[in-house]
Amino acid sequence: MTTILLKENEPFEVAIRRFRRAIEKNGLIAELRERQSYEKPTTARKRKKAAAVKRLHKRLRSQMLPKKLH
């Protein structure tokens, strides 16, 4: 469980912001989104494979040198 201690004279909004950052850092929000609905293992593998291919194409596109203009 993520907890934060309120500092003396700290506004509530600042404490909420610190709490949200702590939760985001722990990965709790991402885990909740994953567990929101069941995803079949085959679908998860397919999604991860597609993301890997997309990353590969993006990396290759950035490494390609532009053609020489004469």
UniProtKB/Swiss-Prot annotation:
GO cellular component, one term: ribonucleoprotein complex
InterPro entries: Ribosomal_bS21, Ribosomal_bS21_sf
Any one GO BP annotation for this protein: translation
Keyword annotations of the record: Ribonucleoprotein, Ribosomal protein
Pfam families given in the database record: Ribosomal_S21
Family membership noted in the UniProt record: Belongs to the bacterial ribosomal protein bS21 family.
Protein known as: Small ribosomal subunit protein bS21A
Organism in which the protein naturally occurs: Paraburkholderia xenovorans (strain LB400)
Recorded name of the encoding gene: rpsU1
